[in-house]
Amino acid sequence: EQNWQEAVKWYEQGAQCGDLQSMNNLACCYEDGEGVEQNEDRALYWYRRSAEGGNGGAMYNLGRCYKMGHGVEQNWQEAVKWYEQGAQCGHLQSMNNLAYCYEYGEGVEQNEEKALYWYRRGAEAGSDYCMYCLGWNYSNGEGVEQNMTEAIRWYTAAAEGGNADAMHDLGWLYDHGEGVEQDMKKAICWYERAAEQNCPAAMNSLGECYAMGRGVPRDLETAMEWYRRAAELGEAMADYNMGWHLEQAGKLSEAYAHYRKAADGNDDSAWWALGRFYENGVVVAQDGKEARRCYETGEKLGSVKCKMRLARCKLLGIGGRRAKKAGLDLCRQALELAKESSEKEDYGYEAEMNLLRRTIAENES
């Protein structure tokens, strides 16, 4: 029968005898309050004893304490020092975290080459997280030349190792035929496997497939259920997608609520949707300045739809002074950018391009 108090008793005896793993386990108990009263000072003491004795797991845990400020003042440099030692001992999670620190410049000067080195070391040693990160770097050309063959290889290895993010990203590549021949059966399979592990991005992607009838029979009710589950886990894009379908169904107040929640989660398309509501006075009072602010926020997040709307606002003087010549130039630039954008599959995208074309034509004379 499980008994944390007995476990702590034996870990304590092992630690007193100099067993490094017992020290690390005892420290974990003190940190989490398992079988003993929580005591961060005691946890830090035993992590340090174990780490100084050469235990890679304790080195990782000590680094994590410095990173989080558990029992000690937060210190990223100390965290990196212990992650480095743990990584050199072959501890996989230390490799993961050290690579992350180099990638994002946390506690150490940003260095993509070193980040990639440790991701590769971790991946080759069996870390599914490092495999996923390596796949992501190859897919996006971060720190290495873009190579979709390598991306697929590492995503597949990570997904087969149980990494839900890799399952989703691999599914997305099969879904869109990027770096691999489009295969909706495989896409749906990977999305479903990731969703089973509560991956919100995969739930959202499944929702999109059901909404569009892509790889599965079109079923809006099932799509909305997947969106709902994803949104409950914090997936902002799922709230946006729910908002879109509610808007199409004429449930405008509900749509606005989901758009607002998605915008609060930094979904760029949600800012476009909110801007439209304010521009046209849908559910809310018509407010050109607020519409323009929404479009500006979405544009900063990368939304081409917001860029098109913002250019149109400047041309027509919505929410600010009208600037016909400069506005026309911005509209033409936005339209050219829109033609090449990866957002083309987004809801409402073609309608936005057509609106901008009409606006340009009406104001060129």
Label every model-predicted segment.
Residues 3, 16-19, 32-34, 39, ...:
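Short helix-capping/linker turns of helical repeat alpha-solenoids
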Residues 14, 49-50, 86, 121-122, ...:
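Canonical positions in the second alpha-helix
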Residues 25-32, 59-68, 97-104, 131-140, ...:
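Hydrophobic face of amphipathic alpha-helices that form TPR/SEL1-like repeat modules
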Residues 204-205, 211, 217, 221, ...:
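Ankyrin-repeat and related helical/solenoid repeat scaffolds used for protein-protein interactions
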Residues 340-365:
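Terminal, low-structured helical/coil segments at or just beyond the last alpha-helical repeat
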